[in-house]
């Protein structure tokens, strides 16, 4: 009986020591191995509006595809908000540069792009609702087929998962939708 208790005590002490060592080990930094990180990563790098736009007067958005975050500044530059996003799945699908919001739609319909139809000929347009890939709100950019929109599939946020669009949680696109009028300046980097 004493041997059994001693073995159990030794095992408990060993497990406690291992747990303590694990807690004392520092976590790996996000930049330790960026090539191996595949899921839900966002560095939320800080940006200043002056680094992207010459003047104030209209709200501004910077979609940072590297850190997978969308930065918003109001027309005065004082209100800065950061939203986690999904970004295009590849650099080939990522259009970078300056554009603006040209149209907004609450409860948007989705239509596959020509390139999506070539890859997936059975895909059909989807009206508003829980199956719609654009989520609850969409802000259309001056570039054809590029949209800042919501998503019902929250697993996509923080990942490279779109065919060119910038996706946000539905709650966050609803907030941004109210802040950004047509004419809001947008830069995708």
From Swiss-Prot:
Molecular-function GO term, any one: glycosyltransferase activity
Enzyme Commission no: 2.-.-.-
First and last residue of the signal peptide: 1-35
One annotated Gene Ontology cellular component of this protein: extracellular region
Keywords from the UniProt entry: Cell shape, Cell wall biogenesis/degradation, Glycosyltransferase, Hydrolase, Peptidoglycan synthesis, Signal, Transferase
Cited InterPro entries: LD-transpeptidase, LD_TPept_cat_dom, TAT_signal, Transpep_catalytic_dom
Gene3D superfamilies recorded: L,D-transpeptidase catalytic domain-like
Posttranslational mods: Predicted to be exported by the Tat system. The position of the signal peptide cleavage has not been experimentally proven.
Enzyme class: transferase
Active-site residues, as the UniProt record annotates them: 149 (proton donor/acceptor), 165 (nucleophile)
Matching Pfam families: YkuD
Pathway: Cell wall biogenesis; peptidoglycan biosynthesis
This protein's record includes keyword Hydrolase: yes
Domain L,D-TPase catalytic: residue ranges: 59-189
GO BP annotations listed: cell wall organization; peptidoglycan-protein cross-linking; regulation of cell shape
Keyword Nucleus: no
Matching CDD domains: YkuD_like
Record-linked PANTHER family: L,D-TRANSPEPTIDASE, L,D-TRANSPEPTIDASE ERFK_SRFK-RELATED
Family: Belongs to the YkuD family.
Entry protein name: Putative L,D-transpeptidase in ATP synthase subunits region ORF 5
Organism: Fuscovulum blasticum (Rhodobacter blasticus)
Lineage: Bacteria, Pseudomonadati, Pseudomonadota, Alphaproteobacteria, Rhodobacterales
